[in-house]
Regions:
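Acidic, Ser/Pro/Thr-rich low-complexity regulatory regions
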Residues: 1-106
Length: 106
């Protein structure tokens, strides 16, 4: 599966909250759930080997969970052939998951 057009958002707590809010409300989001998951992964990777401040450190487990759940959702929903050939730009994880992640940030 090839990557999406990257979401153009800075790697900040406010952006993470905004991205998760868009995930919970995909009809009003400029980004797909795939783009949101990929953005979460890039955010996490940026701080992988860096001592980030506490605000960022507290976000990282949630961001990792978003990306991991995206992968698991696809693997548990689609065949290997579909995973290799489809782009999943229109696929959506359950909105409730995004609401749960947002509640963990509160």
């Amino acid at each position: 599966m090839k990557p999406s057009r990257p979401a153009d958002m800075p790697f900040t707590r406010a952006s993470a909250v905004r991205m998760l809010t868009w995930g919970a409300n995909p009809d009003s989001s400029p980004y797909s759930h795939k783009q949101i998951a990929e953005w979460c992964d890039r955010f996490w990777c940026k701080y992988l080997e860096v001592d980030a401040d506490a605000e960022i450190e507290n976000l990282l487990p949630i961001l990792t969970h978003v990306e991991t759940q995206w992968d698991l959702y696809l693997v548990n929903t689609y065949s290997i052939e579909a995973l290799q050939t489809q782009d999943f730009e229109q696929e959506q994880m359950p909105k409730e998951w995004f609401n749960e992640w947002l509640s963990q940030l509160a």
